[in-house]
Amino acid sequence: MARSLKKGPFVDDHLMAKVEKLNETDKKQVVKTWSRRSTIFPQFIGHTIAVYDGRKHVPVFISEDMVGHKLGEFAPSRTYKGHASDDKKTRR
């Protein structure tokens, strides 16, 4: 279900403040965040944001195509190791 248009996009205030501070000083630093729920804004373009996936921070370089998506979409939190193998082949 999509978010209501009257509410607008969500971004954590502390993350937005960090990115705006970097934009004012023209620095390119990695910003660590645990906020997977934040929407990517146009101000984030060109920055690298390290998004926490439950074990480590995954660096995500923000490009124009990512605007409007959530940060958590680019840092998968689950590792898929395949289905369990079928042992019928080894029994023969």
UniProtKB/Swiss-Prot annotation:
Give an example GO molecular function.
structural constituent of ribosome
Q: Which InterPro entries match?
A: Ribosomal_uS19, Ribosomal_uS19_bac-type, Ribosomal_uS19_CS, Ribosomal_uS19_SF
**What SUPFAM superfamilies is this protein classified in?**
Ribosomal protein S19 (SSF54570)
From which domain of life does this come? Bacteria
Record has Secreted as a keyword: no
Pfam families for this protein: Ribosomal_S19
Q: Which NCBIfam families match?
A: rpsS_bact
What does this gene product do?
Protein S19 forms a complex with S13 that binds strongly to the 16S ribosomal RNA.
Its family remark reads:
Belongs to the universal ribosomal protein uS19 family.
Q: Which PANTHER family match?
A: RIBOSOMAL PROTEIN S19P FAMILY MEMBER (PTHR11880), SMALL RIBOSOMAL SUBUNIT PROTEIN US19M (PTHR11880:SF8)
Q: What is this protein called?
A: Small ribosomal subunit protein uS19
Q: Which organism is it from?
A: Bacillus pumilus (strain SAFR-032)
